[in-house]
């Protein structure tokens, strides 16, 4: 095929024909699958049932820890959807020894980060630290995990922020598409048909006691997996994680998921939003 391209010569644009031997009338054959070599890793289980997986990665002097508690949105009753996400937001606030601002200042001094998030199937605590500052960062992680302080003022503020975000999303094409797609795929009444952030009417009735109970009942050892990746050996990191044995040694019962709609034919759904600056497309099936 031939393509025309304009080129500049002494300030004047000249048309030059570019010859291409690529056949665009047929799909090219896929190349060989790349060989993926998994790094060596180690596994262990603490006395309270926590599974830990780790791998040495010494390219840069950092350590990353990811704590994943199964549950999240799945542990919520339908009338209080958004509880897991709101609890995670509250855990990012004050602790027994630090205000939220002071906690972030300490992290900044260390060049570290700690965050708590909740999704459709779990709550995750993520930590990143320079190797030389690992001990100090782990002390802050322990503080965040065991000494988070929940206050009515924080609940009111964070709940209102979430509600305002949900209201704003009603005008965003991407959010509209995601919300409609979830309900079509999973069906009304399915937990995954609702955003983990919850809905306005469910958020409004969540109490401080709900937050406290959810934190205590969901962050338990039997649903926790820990991943450690970074510039540290197994025999060095495990003693530093001894504080994890203080996590309650108990499990929780995850609710069974209802069946999803059976889709037997291709169907096109159109959401008309006049003057929208962009279009969104979602394609999928269960």
Per-region residue spans from a language model:
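Histidine-acidic residue clusters that define the catalytic metal-binding segment
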Residues: 25-44, 183-224, 254-261
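Residues that act as N-cap/strand-start positions at coil-to-secondary-structure junctions
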Residues: 36-38, 108, 265
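An aromatic/glycine/proline-enriched structural segment found at the starts
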Residues: 4-16, 188, 220-221, 225-286
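Peptidyl-prolyl cis-trans isomerase
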Residues: 147-150, 206-208
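Short acidic-hydrophobic surface loop/beta-edge motif
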Residues: 42-47, 269-272
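M16 family metallopeptidases and their MPP-like homologs
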Residues: 1, 53-55, 59-147, 159-167, ...
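C-terminal regions of mature proteins
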Residues: 1-45, 53, 225-230
């Amino acid at each position: 095929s031939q393509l025309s391209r304009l080129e500049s010569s002494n300030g004047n644009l000249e048309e030059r024909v570019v010859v291409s031997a690529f056949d665009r009338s047929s799909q090219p054959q896929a190349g060989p699958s790349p060989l993926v070599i998994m790094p060596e890793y180690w596994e262990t289980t603490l006395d309270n049932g926590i599974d830990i997986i780790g791998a040495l990665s010494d390219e840069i002097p950092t350590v990353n820890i990811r704590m994943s508690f199964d549950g999240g949105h799945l542990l919520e009753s339908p009338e209080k959807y958004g509880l897991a996400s709101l609890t995670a937001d509250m855990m990012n606030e004050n602790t027994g020894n630090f205000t939220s601002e002071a906690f972030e200042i300490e992290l900044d001094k260390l060049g570290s980060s700690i965050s708590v998030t909740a999704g459709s199937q779990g709550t995750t605590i993520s930590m990143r630290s320079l190797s030389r500052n690992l001990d100090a960062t782990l002390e802050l992680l322990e503080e965040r995990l065991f000494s988070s302080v929940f206050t009515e003022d924080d609940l009111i503020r964070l709940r209102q922020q979430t509600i305002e975000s949900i209201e704003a999303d009603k005008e965003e094409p991407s959010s509209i598409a995601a919300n409609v797609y979830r309900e079509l795929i999973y069906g009304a009444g399915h937990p995954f048909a609702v955003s983990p952030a919850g809905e306005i009417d469910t958020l409004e009735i969540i109490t401080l006691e709900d937050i406290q109970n959810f934190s205590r009942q969901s962050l338990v050892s039997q649903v926790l997996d820990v991943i450690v990746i970074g510039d540290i050996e197994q025999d060095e990191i495990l003693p530093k994680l001894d504080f994890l044995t203080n996590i309650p040694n108990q499990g929780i019962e995850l609710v069974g998921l209802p069946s999803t709609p059976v889709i037997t034919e291709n169907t096109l759904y159109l959401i008309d939003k006049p003057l929208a600056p962009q279009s969104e497309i979602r394609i999928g099936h269960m």
